[in-house]
A protein has these predicted regions:
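Residues lining hydrophobic/aromatic ligand-binding pockets adjacent to catalytic sites
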Residues: 1-146
């Protein structure tokens, strides 16, 4: 399991963050790494993006592995090319982490309707960097509401 922290002191690279990371490591607890850069670096052109920019934490991205299953929560925006550009930094990190554990990657978007497009956009690059990722997960289609 993992813990996603939001208090600014846990991102200041000071004693509080060091104690947090040490404590998580000693207890074999993963630190969830939130990457909301796509949300906060884009123009808010949709109601979902406006809402996300107001609600999603804007915290520095600290790629820290505190246990054997590091967790990355990547929140993409509406612009898939921009998402791909910002995701590139994760390719090498996820591949490196895979050598010593099993990284977890959570991809989502402010408007859930864009989530399948985000997976389609990023998965080819992810698989090239980390062949063990395999094929993109199948996204079930809802045939009807009732």
């Amino acid at each position: 399991y993992g813990v996603e922290v939001r208090h600014p002191e846990f991102f200041a690279k000071g004693e509080a963050e060091q104690q947090l990371n040490r404590g998580l490591h000693e207890r074999n607890v993963n630190r969830v790494i939130l990457d909301s850069r796509p949300v906060h670096s884009a123009a808010a052109t949709s109601p979902a993006m406006i809402d996300a920019q107001q609600k999603k934490p804007k915290v520095p991205v600290h790629a820290v592995m505190t246990a054997r299953q590091p967790m990355v929560r990547f929140i993409g925006g509406d612009d898939m090319a921009h998402n791909r550009e910002l995701f590139r930094v994760w390719l090498q990190t996820l591949a490196k982490w895979h050598q010593s554990g099993t990284p977890w990657l959570f991809l989502h978007t402010p408007d859930i309707a864009f989530a399948p497009a985000l997976v389609d956009t990023l998965w080819g690059d992810l698989r090239a960097a980390l062949p063990a990722a395999g094929n993109a997960p199948s996204i079930p289609q809802q045939s009807s509401l009732f």
